[in-house]
Amino acid sequence: MRRSGIPAGDTPDGGGVRSARAAADAPERPRGARALAAGSCVLGAIVAWTLGTGPAAHAEPVAACLLPRTAAHHSEGVVDPAGATPAGTAPAGYPRAQGDVNALMVFLSFPDAPPALDPQAVAADHYPATARFWSAASGGRFRLHLHTVDRWLTMPRPATAYRINRDWRGADRTAYLRDALTVADPEVDFRGYDVVYLVADPEAPGVDSDATKVVNLARPVTLDGNPLARLVTVFERHPPDRNVLAHETGHVFDLPDLYDRPPPGSTADWDTQVGDWDLMGSQFGLAPEPFAWHKWKLGWLRPGQVACVTGPGTSYYDLAPDESPGGGTKLLVLRTGPDSVLAVEARGRGGNDADACRTGVLLYRVRADRESGDGPVTVVDGHPGSSACAATSVYPPLADAPLGVGESYALPGGAARVTVTGREPDGDWAVRVTQRTAGARDAGRDA
């Protein structure tokens, strides 16, 4: 056979699939006709402090806000620890989410359940929707092309024999992968594919949709000379949950799970960290557009679209909505520690975010030292006393998280404040940032 063995030490990503569930005024901005909101709404958690009229803060070269990668699985770091690898360069073993990327979809059936569905009908559950999602999110910089094996390949054992479930035992998962590749290898040419989806017959007994996930191999498996470090195992229903394969594809390109999985037996909510914001939190979210931080990490933001604020004083920015396809500043970053930043971006209602509950300026904390599924990103609740879109949001308390005109947020301890001062005719959001010290510190984080 033309493959190396499947090592028993493979590990899964957490898998994004689960059952559907639903102040004192600063000096006026010294730029053109930008309307300032009358007064600012200071949030309850803010420590009030008066903004001075000291030196204007300035945007440093973005290198000052790049977080180093850590040993955390799917680290949110953008560069290697030595700072030698630029944003958009994939870590070792990961493909780059840029340009034309080829994906292969292999369909697996089971001997006790002849499939009733045509493979192309199953493929249509996921494509072209998955490719369209990532093309829109990247502004056309990432183009995913699907190639399918247009027939079912029969596994040697029933699906029930593999005990497929979300918390799949390693031995059962390894047996499934070994059998799948043994069946596929003589029939499929794996050369040239960066992404491989192994899709099980959704109607076969023993196929559990909650088990869909990316499996990271302890050692790459080489198929037709193509080393693959991870495989996407798909066990979805027909039709599937929306955006589920787009979420799993994000893992292939080193994006982490942003939900916070409760301990076994707990009934706590999964979506308390980011709510509807970003596909990697929930594929059911109302605003699944990837965070601008993720777009920077994947190399989709052009030079000049990221601003890094470090020095003390006051500075002003116009933020173009994250989901908009054009140019403009998409990401504002305040360094808060060796492994953490406060990220600021605008969110509108268009593209992948057409169903967003609220628009405005969204703030979130990013930690490069947090594991996937352990809170690497936390959205700042801009309205902690309220919630929104209760009937459709995955986590209503964060559905209205963005700040509106006249509202502000200050880091605990008052090291920095972000204020939304206006909305421009072109849809951009005007933001004022004031820092008291060089490099904001987020109290309780990296202290």
Regions found by a protein language model. Give the residues of each.
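Non-catalytic C-terminal accessory/binding modules of secreted extracellular proteins
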Residues: 2-7, 46-50, 66-71, 218-220, ...
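Intrinsically disordered, low-complexity acidic/polar segments
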Residues: 114-115, 207, 289, 353, ...
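Zn2+-dependent metallopeptidase catalytic core
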Residues: 54-237, 246, 264, 419
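Secretory targeting and sorting signals
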Residues: 29-59
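Non-catalytic surface loops within mature trypsin-like serine protease
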Residues: 109-112, 202, 284, 348, ...
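Terminal targeting segments of Actinobacterial cell-envelope proteins
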Residues: 1-33, 444
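Extracellular hydrolytic enzyme modules, especially secreted metalloproteases
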Residues: 190, 195, 203-353
